[in-house]
Swiss-Prot record:
Responsible for the release of ribosomes from messenger RNA at the termination of protein biosynthesis. May increase the efficiency of translation by recycling ribosomes from one round of translation to another. It is found in: Cytoplasm. Keywords: Cytoplasm, Protein biosynthesis. This is Ribosome-recycling factor. One of its GO terms (molecular function) is ribosomal large subunit binding. The gene is frr. Pfam families: RRF. PANTHER family: MITOCHONDRIAL RIBOSOME RECYCLING FACTOR PSEUDO 1, RIBOSOME RECYCLING FACTOR.
């Protein structure tokens, strides 16, 4: 019976939604410097778009400062442009091959906006998890209708899918709560 339906595959897909949320939340600016803030930055390098981390080293020497060490001197202007074009609201200050980004304090209004964005990301992740649950339950129902699994197996698998869904939603809620706390901490 386990070869007809794999709950672990559903869990993996649900985990993917939580990982995606973690990545999206990492890109939200919280007033505290973080190397992950620059993950969405794309740089026009060598004739193609590349992630910033493929042309430079990003570090956080101070709580409100991000340092970008560009490997190739000819790429400094392109990296600056990529940072400005990313709409992160950061102003690059260049010294040779090092670009410094000061992270300004967030005002109350901007903090509330960021919390709303975080909630939107979390809701999208919850919806993705629910879609995975629906796919799983539909598959189980089809297997039962085709008499490939018994009604008891269907009920047991339905419960396992629901348990996996609850765990994934709880993880998403925890990620959101942590990010909200980080954003609202002055």
């Amino acid at each position: 019976m386990s070869d007809k339906f794999d709950v672990n595959e559903l869990k993996r897909r649900m985990q993917g939604a939580a990982q995606s949320l973690k990545h999206e939340l990492g890109g939200l600016r919280t007033g505290r410097a973080s190397a992950s803030m620059l993950e969405p930055v794309q740089v026009d390098a060598y004739g193609s778009h590349m992630p910033l981390n493929q042309v430079a080293t990003v570090s956080v020497p101070e709580p409100r400062l991000i340092s970008v060490q560009v490997w190739d001197k000819s790429m400094v202007k392109a990296v600056e442009k990529g940072i400005v074009d990313s709409n992160l609201g950061l102003s690059p200050a260049t010294e040779g091959q090092v670009i410094r980004l000061r992270i300004p304090e967030l005002n109350e209004e901007r903090r509330k906006e960021l919390v709303k964005v975080a909630h939107k990301y979390a809701e999208a992740a919850r919806v993705a998890v629910r879609h995975v649950r629906r796919d799983g339950l539909d598959t189980i129902k089809k297997l039962e209708k085709a008499h490939e699994i018994s009604e008891d197996d269907q009920k047991r698998l339905d419960q396992e899918v629901q348990k996996a869904t609850d765990a994934a939603i709880a993880e998403i809620d925890q990620l959101l709560a942590n990010k909200e706390k980080e954003i609202l901490t002055v």
